[in-house]
Regions:
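Walker A/P-loop
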Residues: 25-47
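Nucleic-acid-processing active sites and adjacent nucleic-acid-binding tracks
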Residues: 101-102, 286, 305-315
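Inter-Walker segment of RecA-like/P-loop motor cores
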Residues: 75-123
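Conserved pre-motif I regulatory segment
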Residues: 1-30
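Conserved Walker A/P-loop ATP-binding site and its immediately adjacent core
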Residues: 58-77
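ATPase catalytic-site recognition across NTP-hydrolyzing enzymes
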Residues: 201-294
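ASCE P-loop NTPase helicase motor core
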Residues: 81-84, 88-89, 132-238
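Walker B catalytic acidic pair
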Residues: 128-129
Length: 315
């Protein structure tokens, strides 16, 4: 999560590099693939707060899969400005759609519609729960940003960028497509699951009877040097309750962020690491009958599934 915050604020600047400035051709676009309830909406609001405070004149649009989703990020932002140290920076009272600072910085909630998106020319668009977006709307968002001259640790200008935040749960869905297309030169991907944002595991909680031990393997207790008062986004007790309510596939998809949920696919047990093999080398073919099934690929590439039935009847 902190890597996302650093990227959102410093944009393409890499402080682990000896270079004095970021490469000019790098993009600030990024994708956040994170578990449900793991703080991605709050962190996007926090990134928006930092931009508003330290990048005078910046224009930011908050766009959700629904207007209600957009307002959730806006509500986080409103609560952050309740701080006595920040409230005097406001140029006007925060409305249900807009935050305006005396510096000229503005953050505004957008309705998830073509009309509102196409009329925008801003520095940053933060798209929450992009899995729920219509594809045409997502395409329209890509043409809404522009850079702004402003010297800072991010370089000599603030880069126009689009951020996509969501849980990836639909195979072949929009978020899956965005992640697949996100080569290093186009978008940086940040991914975290429930184990990355758990609150400290109390000593009274035993691993032997813990329903999430198969995933955790005791690592939370081993790594946790935080004080007991530290806060995560999800408590151990809540994580245990959530795990007890769902099947393994849903847990891996929506909470561990390992892969999309395949429960509605034809072959949910298919695993590329196991079932995708190189073409056989020349030589006598193994005995048995061969079968081939073809998917012409409405969403992805066409694929052929090969199977052999040996003389024992094993497929």
């Amino acid at each position: 999560p902190f890597d996302y915050l650093a990227h959102a604020f410093f944009e393409v600047r890499d402080f682990n590099s000896a270079a004095a400035a970021p490469p000019p051709n790098h993009t600030a676009d990024c994708v956040v693939w994170a578990a449900r309830g793991s703080g991605k909406t709050f962190l996007a609001a926090l990134a928006t707060l930092l931009d508003l405070l330290f990048k005078p004149g910046i224009q930011i649009k908050l766009l959700g899969g629904s207007l209600e989703q957009s307002r959730r990020m806006h509500e986080h932002l409103r609560r952050l400005f309740d701080s006595p140290a920040l409230a005097p920076l406001l140029a006007a009272p925060i409305t249900s759609r807009r935050v305006t600072l005396k510096s000229g910085s503005v953050a505004e909630v957008l309705a998830a519609s073509q009309t509102s998106v196409r009329g925008s020319r801003v520095q940053k668009v933060r798209c929450d729960e992009v899995e729920l977006f219509d594809l045409d709307l997502w395409r329209a968002v890509q043409l809404t940003t522009r850079s702004m001259p402003l010297q800072g640790p991010w370089g000599d200008h603030v880069r126009g960028c689009v951020e996509a935040l969501s849980t990836l749960h639909e195979p072949g869905g929009l978020m899956s497509r965005i992640v697949d297309e996100s080569a290093p030169a186009t978008r940086r991907v940040f991914r975290w699951g429930v184990l990355d944002v758990l609150a400290p595991c109390p000593p009274a909680h035993t691993c032997d009877t813990c329903i999430i031990h198969d995933d955790c393997q005791g690592r939370i207790k081993q790594r946790d040097q935080r004080p007991a008062s530290a806060h995560g986004f999800i408590s151990i007790d809540d994580a245990v309750r959530l795990r007890s309510r769902v099947d393994r596939q849903t847990w891996e998809s929506e909470m561990l962020c390992l892969r999309p949920n395949r429960s509605r696919t034809v072959y949910p047990m298919f695993d590329p690491a196991i079932h995708v093999v190189p073409a056989p080398t020349a030589g006598p073919p193994p005995s048995g009958r061969f079968f081939a099934a073809m998917d012409f690929g409405f969403v992805g590439e066409a694929a052929v599934l090969l199977a052999r039935l040996d003389h024992h009847g094993t497929l």
